[in-house]
């Protein structure tokens, strides 16, 4: 299944999902795939409703004078490109985890219990809670995370990208060392270490906040995570 149209909401949403993690329709450089797709639009896409399509459309427009010289097959229809199979629909967001209830270590499945047994169990439970409270809070669990932040292309300003990443502040988050790693085609990605308090910082929320910098960031991945 490829692109369908760029007029209906369904068609534009399909394209927006496809371009959420891509700078170009095919590969890592502009080609005739971008040209035929660009020409299939009758108007500029709405940047508020379809931000990824709008960003791609604006970027490809800057190559308009080079359209005839870009590589690829100019005879293909735009419907030959786009998502395939499982890519055609957006992945549903993970449901929030249900709050864990404190396990009752002395519970019983029986509904008809001897009152004396119930009283004894409740007494044991209270003693358990008192001992647990007397021990005080446990040290905060922390993790060392290596995060990879991928830019759109080789023209992305990596210094600005890193500055925007480090500008994010959260209680329980400490940024560490970083470096730029080559991925090919002249493109480099940011690899940055950070320490998080597990109960305070969600890596999913942190990644989502980083990816809000749509001018610089294509996507993020957790490359490694280690409990401290």
From Swiss-Prot:
Q: Which UniProt keywords apply?
A: Allergen, Elongation factor, IgE-binding protein, Protein biosynthesis
Q: Which GO terms describe its molecular function?
A: guanyl-nucleotide exchange factor activity; IgE binding; translation elongation factor activity
Family under the similarity heading: Belongs to the EF-1-beta/EF-1-delta family.
Please indicate if the UniProt record lists Protein biosynthesis as a keyword.
yes
Q: Which CDD domains match?
A: EF1B
Establish whether keyword ATP-binding is in the entry. Answer: no
- Which segments show compositional bias classed as Acidic residues? 97-115
Q: Specify one Pfam family.
A: EF-1_beta_acid
Put simply, this protein is called Elongation factor 1-beta
Query: Where do the record's region annotations for IgE-binding lie?
Result: 84-93
- Give the record's GO CC terms: cytosol; eukaryotic translation elongation factor 1 complex
Task: Please give the residue ranges the record annotates as the region Disordered.
Answer: 74-116
Positions of disulphide bridges = none
The organism of origin for this protein: Penicillium citrinum
